[in-house]
Curated annotation (Swiss-Prot):
This is Uncharacterized protein ycf35. It is found in: Plastid, Chloroplast. GO terms for cellular component: chloroplast. Keywords: Chloroplast, Plastid. PANTHER family: YCF35. The keyword Metal-binding does not apply.
């Protein structure tokens, strides 16, 4: 039996979410409309969809505040657990936001490194 779960995230910017997914080599498709889930009719705007081999796709849907992850947890087929999957995307998303927004205010990243603990460090310089 299918059970779709909505998982709250803090992903609020589609551009940076797509950049994070691309950097993590997570294939996704933009914009789709779904009208039938679990034999119930819904009108849901899906902003990003990640296909899975079993046909139970993962979706990021805008709820008015953030992109929620919607997935059937019974048919999860990613290499990481749901929590690990979201954490990996969140870490990459945060880095993309920091770099992108820093560039907007005149900073340029000059060095990016991954630390032993799995965190990332980015060094910036000002553009003059």
């Amino acid at each position: 039996m299918s059970h779709f779960t909505n998982i709250e995230t803090r992903f609020q910017n589609l551009f940076y979410l797509e950049k994070a997914l691309n950097k993590l080599d997570i294939n996704h498709k933009p914009q789709k409309k779904v009208t039938n889930i679990n034999s119930k009719s819904y009108d849901i705007d899906i902003n990003l969809m990640i296909s899975q081999p079993n046909g139970y796709d993962i979706e990021f849907c805008w709820n008015g505040q953030e992109y929620e992850l919607i997935a059937d947890t019974s048919f999860w087929q990613q290499k990481d657990s749901i929590k690990g999957f979201i954490n990996n995307i969140a870490k990459q998303y945060a880095g993309e936001v920091i770099i992108g927004e820093s560039k907007k205010i005149g900073f340029q990243p000059i060095k990016y490194q991954q630390n032993k603990d799995g965190s990332n460090t980015c060094y910036f310089t000002t553009l003059e």
